Curated annotation (Swiss-Prot):
Protein name stated in the entry: Beta-galactosidase
Native organism: Hordeum vulgare
Catalytic reaction equation(s): Hydrolysis of terminal non-reducing beta-D-galactose residues in beta-D-galactosides
Similarity remark: Belongs to the glycosyl hydrolase 35 family.
Keyword annotations: Glycoprotein, Glycosidase, Hydrolase
EC identifiers of the protein: 3.2.1.23
Length: 38
């Protein structure tokens, strides 16, 4: 058991897992992308 990594993914307990993450910078994004109608 353990966590290691190779050139493509994390390897958790022998199974490859790919983590995908991101963020949005609201001041740089068009307001229509995140506008909420009330």
């Amino acid at each position: 058991t353990g966590v290691t990594y190779d050139h493509r993914a994390l390897v958790i307990d022998g199974x490859x897992x790919v983590l995908v993450s991101g963020s949005i910078h609201y001041p740089r994004a068009a307001s229509s992308w995140y506008a909420v109608e009330t």
